[in-house]
Amino acid sequence: MPARPARTGASRLGTALVSLSLALLPTALATPHAHAAGRGQVCFFLDTDSAGGAGHAGWAVKDTARADHYIWGTFQGPTLKQPLAMGARIAGGAWRDLSAKSSILAPSKYDFYRCQTTASGNIAHAQRTYRVLARTSYDLLTNNCLTGAGEIFRAYSPAMSTRHLPNGLGGRPNGGGLSPTYYIKTRLTSHASGWGPVNRY
């Protein structure tokens, strides 16, 4: 769904997905765990206020060559001037940079995060997929902030199959057709394995 700052135009379409969102699950306060080089990690970030409660998703993946280096980003969605744009943004650095006030994933913009550790991960594949997606056209059901994050996770680690990233409505991959709030907080709990708790950011 479009990011919180853009609540006009196509972002209002996200309200059509609100009915799909169930009551929010209890969250556990936690801090990110340090991972040694060689282990991978993928994380969803969730803003529950965007799109009338349907939510907006950001993403991050860990560089397996370094103990504390990530790339992260978001597909902020279309604007009135660019009604089909993905609104792609990307950055990199340590977790403290990711969570800094000036970050595109700053805690002031997102409410929760949820991560999964992977045995390995290819950050170059993730970056390549991001660049491809950045040139595509936004679609509310099949090509948005949530599905884009899922595509990047799949490119990063072949282990991120439907067992970990369940399909959405009508078998759409990466939660297509479902709201980010419902998918990240609820469906990853009831229909997926390997995910950590929903942490307040």
Regions found by a protein language model. Give the residues of each.
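Glycine-rich catalytic cores of cysteine/serine-nucleophile enzymes that process amide/ester linkages
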Residues: 37-109
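Solvent-exposed, acidic/flexible segments
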Residues: 51-54, 116-123, 138-146
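N-terminal compositionally biased, intrinsically disordered segments and leader/signal-like regions
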Residues: 9, 16, 32, 65, ...
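Secretory targeting and sorting signals
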Residues: 1-36
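Second-shell loop/turn segments in exported
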Residues: 47-49, 108-117, 131-140
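Extracellular cell-wall/glycan-interacting regions and their flexible linkers
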Residues: 19-24, 33-38, 107, 189-201
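Activation targets extended, charge/polar-rich intrinsically disordered C-terminal tails
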Residues: 125-201
